[in-house]
Every structure is written in structure tokens, then in C-alpha cells.
From Swiss-Prot:
Residue stretches in coiled coil: none
Protein name: Diaminopimelate epimerase
EC number from the UniProt entry: 5.1.1.7
Species of the source: Leptospira interrogans serogroup Icterohaemorrhagiae serovar copenhageni (strain Fiocruz L1-130)
GO BP terms, alphabetized: lysine biosynthetic process via diaminopimelate
Catalytic activity: (2S,6S)-2,6-diaminopimelate = meso-2,6-diaminopimelate
Domain of life: Bacteria
């Protein structure tokens, strides 16, 4: 068995195992990723993120869910990648460009005490609303905003958004009382979502103040989802429920999401290193 060095980090409770692959090209099988992510027999995480060198950006974020499947992007994950590369001396830039499966994203690091990163703002790019590009199998290419979705005995309405990965946003009266763990997996694997989908269940808490629970594709319910929060703000604005500068509370913490005049979405939130170690794989 080989020994693998890792760092565990979290962004408002969305926790991943980070592996620095800038010096050695480390690759793991889906089974190894499942083992590492297991909260009883492994380190325990929502997945594994490799930090790699990039020919297109300054660094590359290579992300995998806890079930071993690959994913294009994670908003909380990219903030942790940005913190790692700065705090561990891999870059001195406060605006590094990070390559992801959703494209190259630029981050803005807010430095706190001890010359460590406290907050990270990420330009998440423009939301995608064209059904075939999300993707959603739909009757036409018009945007899907508050459209009916029947799941079991629930008659829901959903808005479909891609932030580099697919999201289905559903507004409900009380997210905490809603059966997320029962309904979430049914929507995730619904036939209209050919690549499966992340599902957000959202409650309005006040003007430009929303509360979100997330069922993540390949990971189940998580404490937070950054790309999901971006999709929630977009859906809230498009349905007239919120403005373009919104506080979104998640079970793990709070994010600020802004829809800028350029059309791009800006996400700002914390990132924290929990511990480092080695594991036999």
C-alpha cells in the first residue's frame, strides 16, 4: 500500500480532501476516492479535489464526488483551492486563475492575520439558461423558469440553471421541513436530466435573504453548495423573488452572491484548512 499526503479543508461545511498534485501527477481510482471519502472508514468528505498544474491557467482543480464520479465545478471547493495555493506558498498572486471543468475562473483573495487567506471572491462567469446546454431534455430551447415538475405526490415548480454544472432550483415554504432526502435523489436521477442534476430547495427569509438546502449529484445532501447558491440567486431574481445582491444562508454558513452588470456572478465566502495528514491507500 502507498502512503498519500492530503489536506482536509472546508468552505461553509462543504468539505473535501485536497491532494497537491503539482509536483507528482497523482491519480486515484473511483474505488480509492470512495474509500477516502467514507466518513466511517476513511477520512470523510464530500469528495476529493486534486490541485494540478495547468497550461491554461495558473492551477487546475480536478474534482471528484464521494461516489468517485467526476464533477465539473464546486464553488466552495474552488475557494479552498485558492486558499491552499496561497497559504502553502504555491503562488504569491492574490488573483490567480484556476482551470476547472467549467472553464478558467479568476479569484480574488482577501488576506487576513498571519498572511493567511480569510475570504475568497470568485468570478463564476455567466449563468447558462438554455435547456440543451444545462442540460435538460425539454420541449423547446426557452428558459425553464418556474415550470411544473411532478415527483411522486409532489407538484413542484423548478428553474433550471447551469453554473458550469446543472442545477434544479425549487422554492418551498419551509426547506427544513421539506423531505429533501426523499425527493432529492428522485429529482437528481429524473429522466429530463441526462447528466443528473444538483437540486436546491429554497425558502425566502427576507428581502434579498434566502435559505438553501442542497441535494448534490453524486454526494447526497451536503451542508453547502457554492455553485448552487449562485443558481439560487439567479432563479430568485428571474422569478421576482430577490434582487441581484443576495445573502444566502446554508446549513454550513453564509455566502454573498452578486449578479454583476457584466452578467457574471460573483460569489464571496470563507475557506478553512482543518488538518493535514497521510493515509494508506
Amino acid at each position: 500500500m502507498a502512503s498519500l499526503k492530503f489536506t482536509k479543508m472546508e468552505g461553509i461545511g462543504n468539505d473535501y480532501v485536497y491532494i497537491d498534485s503539482t509536483r507528482n501527477d497523482i491519480r486515484l481510482t473511483p474505488e480509492q476516492i470512495q474509500k477516502i471519502s467514507d466518513r466511517n472508514f476513511g477520512i470523510g468528505s464530500d469528495g476529493v479535489i486534486f490541485i494540478r498544474n495547468s497550461k491554461q491557467g495558473d492551477f487546475m482543480m480536478d474534482m471528484y464526488n464521494s461516489d468517485g464520479s467526476s464533477s465539473e465545478m464546486c464553488g466552495n471547493g474552488i475557494r479552498c483551492v485558492a486558499k491552499y495555493i496561497y497559504d502553502h506558498g504555491l503562488t504569491s498572486s492574490k488573483n490567480p486563475k484556476i482551470e476547472t471543468g467549467a472553464g478558467i475562473l479568476e479569484v480574488d483573495l482577501k488576506i487576513g492575520s498571519g498572511n493567511k487567506v480569510d475570504l475568497v471572491s470568485v468570478d463564476m462567469g455567466k449563468p447558462v439558461l438554455v435547456p440543451s446546454q444545462i442540460p435538460v431534455v425539454w420541449k423547446n430551447e426557452e428558459t425553464i423558469i418556474d415550470q411544473p415538475l411532478e415527483i411522486g405526490d409532489k407538484n413542484l415548480k423548478f428553474t433550471a440553471v447551469s453554473m458550469g454544472n446543472p442545477h434544479c432550483v425549487i422554492f418551498v415554504d419551509d426547506s427544513d421541513e421539506f423531505p429533501v432526502r426523499g425527493i432529492g435523489p428522485l429529482i437528481e436521477r429524473h429522466s429530463i436530466f441526462p447528466k443528473r442534476v444538483n437540486v436546491e430547495f429554497v425558502t425566502i427569509r427576507g428581502k434579498d435573504h434566502l435559505y438553501q438546502r442542497t441535494w448534490e449529484r453524486g454526494a447526497g445532501e451536503t451542508l453547502a453548495c457554492g455553485t448552487g447558491a449562485c443558481a439560487v440567486m439567479v432563479a430568485g431574481n428571474l422569478t421576482g423573488r430577490s434582487g441581484k445582491d443576495v445573502q444566502i444562508d446554508l446549513r454550513g454558513g453564509t455566502l454573498r452572491i452578486q449578479w454583476q452588470e457584466s452578467g457574471n456572478i460573483l460569489m464571496t465566502g470563507p475557506a478553512r484548512e482543518i488538518f493535514s495528514g497521510e493515509i494508506e491507500i
